[in-house]
Amino acid sequence: MGAYKYMQELWRKKQSDVMRFLLRVRCWQYRQLSALHRAPRPTRPDKARRLGYKAKQGYVIYRIRVRRGGRKRPVPKGATYGKPVHHGVNQIKFARSLQSVAEERAGRHCGGLRVLSSYWVGEDSTYKFFEVVLVDTFHKAIRRNPDTQWITKAVHKHREMRGLTSAGKKSRGLGKGHKFHLTIGGSRRAAWKRRNTLQLHRYR
């Protein structure tokens, strides 16, 4: 086994004495820092590399702190208006994961960079911490490399806002197999539209 494989196994055994101590110390360290800050290097180099990170110019790591728990509906004094079924304010569950929220915040803060992917690095009772891999698409090391040229195209601007990253796709119900029949055709809306549209072909 290579070094990265050993590292991967370490992260899979989070309840081991070493990892429990490490995660506890790191969570304390991350809490002292701002909610969004640049990390000098990835905390999990094995995971970052599997997601496409390379230790060369053009790649940036940002660490994001996201508050855990449900989402409160942002309405003044609980005045939601409308029918009683939509009066809920407190017990609202957000449709997307906290990881995709972290990616979105990193993408907003670094508008000139592209979000490649992200991964979990720690959590406590109040916060979850994620590291987001961003790419500078104007750097020659990225533009001249055939493996990374795809992300320089304009169609990939703010992928994280449109649910195109790995974390964003999870809440869209996309995938293969019998569990993902609701999104056959690209999305929930596309599947619903096709199933609820009456097609009267000329030759039928």
Swiss-Prot record:
Q: Name one GO cellular component term.
A: cytosolic large ribosomal subunit
Compartments in which it is found: Cytoplasm
- Name any Gene Ontology BP term: cytoplasmic translation
Keywords on record:
Cytoplasm, Ribonucleoprotein, Ribosomal protein
Which residues are connected by disulfide bridges in this protein? none
Molecular function per GO: RNA binding; structural constituent of ribosome
Primary location recorded for the protein, binned into one broad class? cytoplasm
Top-level lineage group:
Eukaryota
One Pfam family, please name it: Ribosomal_L15e
Q: Does the keyword Cytoplasm apply?
A: yes
**Family to which the UniProt record says this protein belongs:** Belongs to the eukaryotic ribosomal protein eL15 family.
Instruction: Provide the assembly information.
Output: Component of the large ribosomal subunit.
Task of the protein? Component of the large ribosomal subunit. The ribosome is a large ribonucleoprotein complex responsible for the synthesis of proteins in the cell.
> What protein am I looking at?
Large ribosomal subunit protein eL15
Q: Which organism is it from?
A: Carassius auratus (Goldfish)
Q: Which gene encodes it?
A: rpl15
